[in-house]
């Protein structure tokens, strides 16, 4: 098959995968003078942040909210653009409601006073402890997000320097342990500790550094992009094309090519070879090392080492539309979390035992409350997400056999909050861990790549600059700083600090630098 002309290789950068991390990487590389080509096996950019439309119902397939809009504004500014001119964000308040089987509920808002009132309503004796929790969260936000999360952690010395702060902040405690230290009510302990599930982590084992999410929500609020996260992905693609970048959709990369220890391009599944001066992989880090670099000897990220990591849970997601339901179930807002009778036991079944439990907790997304474009007039669009085991088990769940019975169980839970919903369901689509494995090439169908435990965070994660191959960079959920929209956008920011400017940009800068020196 033909290769790109060598004369054009040096200034070309290839980005494997058009998830939000890959798109952010492409934007930042374009700002550094690279001519970027983004390659993805899907038909539209966005990866998990893309959408599918059926019968007028648009289903946002992955992330549903934006918690740190400033990270996107900074990204656009780097490219000489205005994010708010390209994407409309709408604040959501309340952020979500947490419900328990006993009928009690906890409404999460941005206002500290409103939150303290909610805590007092549930458990008056826990208000003082909640205030301490907020202070703890703020400290970890400034260190864990604004500092650690925005710089590279690829050198061991980077880790050694921060160990005293980790110790001072008791990063050895889990998120749940820290919540339990501050409040006594088990419902509040759950409400203050479940956030790691949003990025694939077990609240009973993930480091307490992740309580910073409470401060993130308080600092920036929770926002919804009109048009869904897919609208953000589409806007990112337009910026890339405006920089002179291009896309190869419906195109799968089979291998990263390495010559004398340096990444020089990729071979596509079709056999075509694309050469480049720089390669960025937004594919899952496990897929990058085990599959795309399968023919290259690796020192650290061997197949055995990748397989030995703890992986995030899988996801069962049911996307569906309902007919004539606008205005029904007014107490079910944009986001609702419906808890199972068990918390710790269910989490252990998912993360430690690899067992598909009969009970379930659901994250219910009803974007039609906020965005009329997601459904036909008078209708609603939903998705219901249930955390489930990934496929890296001795006896993985056979989703071909159990997906439909499990969906029926999800419907039974939904009926408790929205009576009669089953009679009004229209278009329907189900994603299981097998879908994540096949559609997104996610190892073992994990929803969020490598789980963010303390010994799988920062330096311990696959680095943004590859340890195995020169000229290869990694972005996305499996790298530093981690999963979630702020995490993958941040991974591209870290990558850009490590990647060089394009050769042509350096050449163009030389005369100006000489004049300045004179």
Curated annotation (Swiss-Prot):
Record keyword Ribonucleoprotein present: no
Q: Which reaction does it catalyse?
A: 15-cis-phytoene + 3 A = all-trans-neurosporene + 3 AH2
Which cofactors does the annotated protein need, by name? FAD
EC number, as in UniProt: 1.3.99.28
Cite the InterPro entries for this sequence.
Answer: Amino_oxidase, Carotenoid/retinoid_OxRdtase, FAD/NAD-bd_sf, Phytoene_DH_bac_CS
The protein's enzyme class = oxidoreductase
* Pfam families noted in UniProt: Amino_oxidase (PF01593)
Q: Which GO terms describe its molecular function?
A: oxidoreductase activity, acting on the CH-CH group of donors
User: What UniProt keywords apply to this chain's record, in alphabetical order?
Assistant: Carotenoid biosynthesis, FAD, Flavoprotein, Oxidoreductase
Tell me the residue numbers annotated for binding FAD. Answer: 14-47
Matching SUPFAM superfamilies: FAD/NAD(P)-binding domain
State any GO BP term from the record.
Answer: carotenoid biosynthetic process
Pathway listed for it?
Carotenoid biosynthesis
Annotated Gene3D superfamilies: FAD/NAD(P)-binding domain
From what superkingdom does this record's organism come? Bacteria
Q: What does this protein do?
A: Converts phytoene into all-trans-neurosporene as the major product, via the intermediary of phytofluene and zeta-carotene, by the introduction of three double bonds.
Q: Which NCBIfam families match?
A: crtI_fam
What family name appears in the similarity comment?
Answer: Belongs to the carotenoid/retinoid oxidoreductase family.
- Protein name per the record: Phytoene desaturase (neurosporene-forming)
Give the source species: Cereibacter sphaeroides (strain ATCC 17023 / DSM 158 / JCM 6121 / CCUG 31486 / LMG 2827 / NBRC 12203 / NCIMB 8253 / ATH 2.4.1.) (Rhodobacter sphaeroides)
